[in-house]
Every structure is written in C-alpha cells, then in structure tokens.
Amino acid sequence: MKKKVVSSFLVFYAMNVLAQTPAIKVDLSQKGADVSPNLFGIFFEEISHAGDGGLYAELVENRGFEEHVLPSSMTYVDGRAVAVDSPNYEHRVNRRWSIDWNMERKKYQGWKMQAKGAVAKATVVEAELPLHENTPNAMRLDIMSVEKGGKVVLTNTGYWGMGLKSGAKYDLRFYVRSDNYKGGITARISDSKTGSTYGYVEFKKRKIKEWTEYTAVLNSTGTTGNGQLSLEFEAKGTVWVDYVSLFPQDTFKGRKNGLRPDLAEMLIGLHPKFMRWPGGCIVEGVTYENRVKWKETLGDPMTRRGEWDAWGYRSTWGMGYHEFLQFCEDIGMDAMFVNNAGMSCSVRNGDFVSSKEDMDAVIQDFRDAIDYAWGDPATNEWAKKRAEAGHPEPFPLKYVEIGNENVGPEYVKHFNYIYPVLKKEYPNIIFINTLGHTDPLLAQIPGDYMVDPHWYRDPNFFFNNNHLFDEAPRTHDIYVGEYACNTGVGAGNLLAAISEAAFILGMERNSDVVKMTSYAPLFENENRRDWPTNLIHFNSNQTFGRASYYVQQMSAENQATYNVFVSETSTSLEVTPFPAGTIGLGSYSTQCQYKNVKITTADGKTVAYEPDQFQKLRGEWKVEGGALAQTSNENLTMATLPAFKGDSYTLEMQAMKTGGMEGFFIYYGMDERGRNGYSVNIGGWANQTTGFQPMQRGRTMDVIGRQVPQRIENNKWYDVKVVVTPELVTLYMDGKEITKAKAPAQTRQFCQTGYDVEKGELVIKVVNGTEKTYTRSFDIKGAKTVAQQGTVIALSGNPLEENSFEEPKKLAPKTTQSNGFGKQFSYEFAPMSYTIIRIKATL
C-alpha cells in the first residue's frame, strides 16, 4: 500500500481563486511601531538542575559535602527544616514555612564508599579544622584495616552520571588532611555501568597533617554518560577529604570554572539580547536569609558557601555573579541582575525587613552589585574585586530588577524607598518593577521604570491573548520576564509552542510598549523536573530543544525593524458558551461567610438554599447563625450545590469576609467534582482586583474579560449578584455593576507583518493553531516592487508530539525558497503551524 506524501504546505493558486478568498491587506507605506531590538532574551534560574549538573560544567555533585546544610535562618525540627516565625509581608499571617529534611541522605548525596579487602567507615561531619570557614563540613574516612592489595574507594557518580568524552582532559582538584594516613591516593575516572577505567593518576604518599591540595589532569580514553570519579586509599588511618572537583577543560570559550559548551551553544542559538539572572523565586528565598547573596558567589569556588534554594536542592553558586557577567560579555548580550528587595517569597515564608537600617543595607547591596559590574577599580572596593578576578574593564550590566514577583502595598513601600536612590545615583541603569502592567498599585509609584508581568498558562490563554497588549497602558515599558504554555501540554508539545507563537505576535505588534521578553524556565536536567515545561532538555552528554525553543529561535532570527499595517491580525472562530453546571462558594487564604443564597432561573422561578444543602469539597465549613462559614486559611476552598445545575440564572446572596488576605470566590458552570468550570474572584490578587477565571483540573487559569480594582473590607456584609447566561456573566455588588465577561471566543489564526530595513524584506508571520489547512490571499500595497521569490521558514506537525533525545529535531523549522509571491498571492498554511515568509520589497 502506497503512502500519500504531501510535498509542500505552501501551494499557490490562480487569480480566479484570489477573487474568492478574503484578502489580508498589507500596506508597507503605513508604518507601525518600531520592533524593539531587545525583544528576545533569556532568563536563567537554578531550577531543575539548570546550573549545577547543567550549564555549570562541574562534574562532581556535593563536592564540598555541604548538601545537608539547612537553608539560612531555618532550624531542624522533627525531620523538617522550619522557617522563622515571622509575619508574611503580603497578608501578615505568620506562616512558619517548612519542608521535609532527610539530613542523613543529603549528607551523602552523590557519594558512596566501598571497602575492598578493608574495614572502614565514612562519615560526613563538621571538621574540627575546616578547609574553609564558609564550608565547614568534610568527609571523614576511618580506615581501620587494609589487607594486602585492598583499598577503600570513595566514589562520586556526579549528577546522574558524569559526561566523559574520549580524548578530553579534566582538571582534578581535591583536599586531604590526616595525622596518621601513610599511603598513596589514586584518582580514577571510569564507567559506572561497565566498570571500564578511562583514566587514572597515582599520588605518592606525603605528609598531610595540614589540609593539602591535590591537582592533576585526567585524560579520558572513553566516552560515556555514566562516568564516575573515585579516590582510592591503600592504608589505614583517619583521612579527612573535602572539596573534590572534576572540571572539563573543554568549557565555553575555554574559561576556567566555566560553562558546558553544548548548552551554551543552545543559548547562543536563541540570539538573546539580554540575560536575566539569578532568578526567579530563589532571589526572594524561602526566607529572607535564604535569598541569593551575590557576594557569596564570588571568588575561588572552594570558598563559596552555596545555599539550598527554593527548588529543593543546594546550589554551589559555582556559576556566580562574575560568571554570569562574563557569559553576557562573551556572547554580546546585556546583563539583567535581579536582587532581593527586602522580602522573601510570599508563597513560602514571606518574612521581610522594614527598618531604615535594614533597608539602607538593601540599597547598599544593590550599589555594590552595580559597582562590581561598572565601577572604577582605582576608586571602588567592589570594582577592585572585579579587576582582581581578571576583568578590569566594565561588564555589560544594563538592567537591574528590584525584587522578583513581589506584590502588594509592602512591596510598594520597599520599591519607593530603593528605586529613587538608585535611579539618582545610576541614571543609565534601566530599573524594573515586579508588578504587572495593569496593577493599580503602579499609580502609587512614581518614576521611569519597566514592569514585569508573568504568565504560565494553558494553550487557550496564549491563543486568546494575542491582543492582550493592544490596549495596555503606555505609562511604563513592559518586560514580560516569564511566560510559558505549561498546562495540559505534556513536557511541552507542539500545541504549546504554537500557542506561544500567537502570544509572541501580539507582543511584537505592541513593541512600542513591550520592549523585552524571556521564556521560562530555560533548562531541565532529564532526571529532575521542578516545573512542568522547560525550553531546553539535557542529560550528562546530550541536549535538545523543545518545539518552543524553535518558536523562540524563529522569532528572534526574523525580527522586523518596524511593523506595517495589516488589515487582519486574527481570525475568531466559534464562541465557546459558558457550560451548564452547578454553583459554588469559597475563598483563597480567607475566612468568610455566606447567607440568604437564592437562584432565579430563566423561567422566573426563585429557589432559596440552606447552608446544609451545600457539599463541602475543600476547606473547613460550618454553619454559624444561619450562615455558611469557611474558617480555614486554605487556598481555593469550595462548597458546591449539587441540587442545582443550569446555564441561565441569577445567583444572589450576602457575603462577609471575617479574616485572611483576599475576598470571595463564587463558582459557576462547575462540574460535580468542583474541578472544571469558572469562578468570580472578588477582591483577589492580594485583595486588590476582581475578575473572572476559568477553572481547570482544580486550578484557576488566567482572567477572561477585564480585571477591575476592588477591595473587600472585613466584617461587612455585601449583597452579591451574579447573572449567568451562556454568552455573558455579570457581577453586581450592593446594587452596582462591577464587571462582566463574555464567553471566550476560540481564536486560533493570527497574522503579523513588518519590514526589515537592513535586508529590504517584507516579513509576514502567520500562526495556524487549528488542525485544518488555513488558506488566505494577500494584497501588498505601499511597495514599488515585491519579489516573486521568497524564503519560507515553517514549523508544523502533530500538536501532541514532542521532541526527545531519540528524535531531537522531530519538531523543527524547515526553510525553503518558493516562487509565486508578488503584490498579490495566495497560499495555504499547514495545520498547527508557525510560518514566516520573507520577501524582497523595495519602498
């Protein structure tokens, strides 16, 4: 049986077809917004072993035996690491965040000891005479006896296996101390699966009563992703071992303490204009003392204390502030440094500082970071340290973000204290605020700064929000610092990538206000996933980019200089009505009460419902004085009404907030389990705004319609009315309309056009997010000539497929040269595709 083969997705039609197809008009004489030359950058955070065990080239895991050290300011209580008991900056509740902490397992992370013809014990303890005060722990080997030919072997398997290459050289460095060990030491690299030795070096016995550094170069004779490093001891005695490092000489640009070249090249392939570092949630820390302290990331890696970070493992900070700045310089991108604003992550502990002394110290920390990158070594202490590290010239630091994902009035106070001082002293730095571009609190913060909204959502959100920025306030430039389609798309399939492409076209169209963007997260070690989707996957010796990687790459490689008029930027398909379902009541980290609940259906019948008719799905519910009360501090509490189901009705009640951080949740169109449907979030987002949100699999998704400012007071009864129809939902409170939202239209086809001045080319970008071929004609105006031949770059395929180590480019763009263009042409786009057409055009 012969397979039918489609040779090309671009098919040109005769002029009689043109007459029947609605034309998309493009006018090159009508110039739109300039496209920001800095629109595409990268964001690096230590998550999913992006750095340690990833971009940072060190092969030894837990090299300083510090993995078990508690996060700063936390204490060990009954098998858990427990945070300080301090008010949360967002809602003033003492959260005392904690996490399971297996102390003994963490001590030996990455290590194992074998006694072969010997009797020995290995213990990680705080050394009596530490190698360095910043890293007080070491491995103690008590070797009681060794038979002839016997040995004690201390082995590190790296981060799920070391990547070794035949012919490559590896710098070995470790420290040993002993009062009574009189034998030699052998260092060996081998394959943990086969046992094959790929290189070794023998160190003769020497006096090691003081900490003694051992160094050598190991030449690998084999290639494996299952490499390991062993230190072999041949005599009895008590031996202390610390800071064991195996570092490939083949790093990006050959830099000492450098980066894994294949992963660095993947970043270069994105053509980034800037890099954001070091985060992310780890900038905030799970507690304030757990934040990233950039000064502790400088100097000899042996002296860097490291820190357990918010994603569940300890970072060595081998890739520190200096290495970040150096990498930016090496590939010609600007540096964006993110520093703590005096508060920890609000969804963890959320503790914060507020005294003048503490806030002045926060400002000084920003100063010192900027001076390290920019300052004059002759006059500045921190610039001198940069010069001493081998870089007397300034680094390309251009942006500084004050905090990460901080919100609410306390952040406003902090920003208003920090920003004016720094902006006055460093007027050429572009400072970034962490609030979203529509946050009403921006009105309380004067100044010329950027804002940084983030979105992690499902494909529908990104398809439906191509026009998100069309009516965005132009008061502050926008940096979309984190975004990704990460819900319901596996580890990142083509559907996710195509939806992101639609969102990118909207940001590009609005580049007069959206100046910068960066996908997040960047990396994932295949052995640890801390976030649902990540742009680049890798293991010890392989890497590949997801389909989203190629969307980013295509977009960055094919930027126009400026946008030009296009008559149609999107095509709306059918409206998806609000579903028939039950209603529900609830809250988010808030205590509240509901009473006098009644529903009037479309036929005019009104039914009142008692508190005991509600099914309590999440939270702690009880009846108090005839009201249904929710008393817990849980998120997304819910009590539904199984007796009701409908899609056209008016829901009325009285609601009162009695405590907590936000307002009310009213659910409609919900399924029986309370997992899918819609919600009215009243006084949400830290009790600042109200909006409608879809619910998917028990999680709220992004807002439909428009958020409006609203604050809910404590101990006040509100009259609440929600009018629901299949096409529209409207919220009234105390007799006044607050906001409304239409049922979402499924928009899946998009077009964006621009002109590349340097190349003299019209750039047409089209997204087809449907599983059907999309055929359109184009009518090009405003150009003297439009070439018949052009370049087509297209990404398409099965929406559910993903790239993998076995098929790393299963989903990757294909570039072809095609004829049949000109001032009028028609073509068809493949199902589920992102296509860029470049045509020479003279103006």
Question: Regions from the language model: what does each represent?
Answer:
Residues K148-G269:
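Extended acidic/polar, glycine-enriched regions
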Residues Q326-F327, Y419-F431, L442, Y449-N558, ...:
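Catalytic-core region of carbohydrate-active enzymes that cleave or remodel glycosidic bonds
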Residues T785-Y827:
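Acidic, Ser/Thr/Pro-rich beta/coil linker or hinge segments at domain junctions
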